[in-house]
């Protein structure tokens, strides 16, 4: 098998550009934001670039101040960055919001069939009796990440 050759400086510069572009986007507390910020948090975990974590923290704090939406499966995607923020800052507010998402998923989220989480984009029940692959990321993987905190 051939050795993987890469330019670390170029990769980190590319990550910087992606992070900067992402942070210029006007995103709300929903699936796109949750997935994007999860990516930035993962970039932080790999590079240890504190700026990435601070950018996510500042934006999440701003969104918290503006007010949290009603929970849906889609809005639970933001839980991933909340877990990362709690892990690295120790600030309980992030954990408390994540726990409220867990409670929603366990007790209130719409389900069908054999207790399968239903894909919900809004409170209008847009996709009755549907489970999507991204539901696994937004809800299933999130629940796995919170096990040691709940």
Question: What residues fall within each predicted segment?
Answer:
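Well-ordered alpha-helical segments within folded domains of soluble proteins
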Residues: 29-44, 71-87, 131-147
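Extracytoplasmic mature domains of secreted/periplasmic and thylakoid-lumen proteins
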Residues: 79-81, 85-135
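Long, well-ordered core segments of solenoidal/helical folds
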Residues: 9-27, 51-70, 96-116
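N-terminal amphipathic/basic leader segments beginning at the initiator methionine
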Residues: 4-6
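Conserved small/polar residues in nucleotide/adenosyl-binding loops
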Residues: 150
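Alpha-helical structural elements
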Residues: 24-26, 32, 127
